[in-house]
């Protein structure tokens, strides 16, 4: 998988309520500057984060992130048994490209889902709408 900072922990904290940059830095074991950079990256990716000086940060809307265990649990047993693996990545260029880099599974299908694709494209090279 493409190396990318996994911001799921940060998003979970921001979704739980308003927290200061200092509190986020302490809880995630990072500097306040690193938290600020990650928040700016999330904003650039389209995540709406409310931030007020002296009041902290909070998601403007609740986000439900992909969870492989929940997805597998919701699949009918005969379908789940046909899967070799089901992985959830934070950010990849293209799920299709990532899967093509892997060797074919000996049995079943390999599934890769991503919260964010930075280089994905539609059929025949069309851009995503």
Locate each region found by the language model.
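N-terminal lobe of the biotin/lipoate ligase/transferase fold
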Residues: 2-129
